[in-house]
Amino acid sequence: MKNILKKIGICLLTILLLLVAFITYHMQSHPVVTIEEVISANEAAQIQMVTKKVESVVEVLKTSYAARFAHAKAHACVKAYLDVNQDIDPQLRYGVFEKPGAHYQSWIRFSNSSSNMANADDRAKDARGMAIKLLNVGENLNSGTTQEFIAHNAPAFFVASVDDFNQFLASKGDLKYFAQGYNPFKWRLRELWQLVTAFAPPPKSPLWTQYFSNTAYKLGPHNIKFMMQSCESPKNIVAAKTDDPDFLKNTLIEELAASEACMQLLVQKQDANKKMPIEDVTILWKESDSPFLPVAKITILKQQFDSPEQQQFCENLSFSPWNALKAHRPIGALNRARKWAYEASANYRHRLNKTQVPQSLDW
């Protein structure tokens, strides 16, 4: 009997060790890190597929109103200032951060990530987004005059390439996408983990969430990612009633009616000697390898933002990572796909809704 129990114990230990090795393989395996972008031979065709699928999703999910392909539900569009830190590291002084103390008007949009407005409940597990649009920065890559930083609440994304994104869209969110075939070493466990991490229970408030760029950008000669977070740790934050499907919006209404809010923008420089790839955005750039460095303060004004006119203005706004100065150019395959996907989503929904992007953004 003892021998049988011993053999069972050895088998269980072996299975456990194999399981640990298997998970470690998926979570720790990394591609070669480069400081340059890598463009695959079929990238243009893959991007064209993404664009068509974006339009298809907008069409299929439209109700009486065609919403965005992603981050369809806005909690608010609010007025804010961005001020470049006076003591910003000289190595980071490029683009809108070139001049210490530079001051910009901006709009910030807070959102849920779901594409489906028919089921847009703040209480549901979902990713959350923050996008800031700086005004009057000079001519950007899309011939506009804004600089936009778009982020969501998870530090890494759940697809590694444009091809993978197309496969995920084709699967319609079926979890079998992450475990295709009989070879477990070809499964996408790291990607599944990133998806589960992003789709978290709702925060108490959009103001007390960390928002990450996921994808990489230029900052002058550097490759960077960025993050936005509150200037201080949460203190006595009371959420609106969570039996309310719009409680995140209502929490913001209460907070910004009482006082202004402070957030900070930080950047993380790529170290090519570390596991910090540009192209595979499922891989976390570890802060132990390269810490986030503060570059600017964001002051969200005390305000009322829930008038029907401002909500419609918010719906008509369009954001894109490519509304950027050359010094902040988006890099990597997924960013290159986003250029066309965001444009397709905006053009398609504006055409269906018979609306236009607001021409005047100043306030």
How would you label these PLM feature ranges?
Residues 1-17:
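N-terminal Sec-pathway targeting helices
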Residues 22-363:
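Active-site-adjacent core segments of small-molecule enzymes
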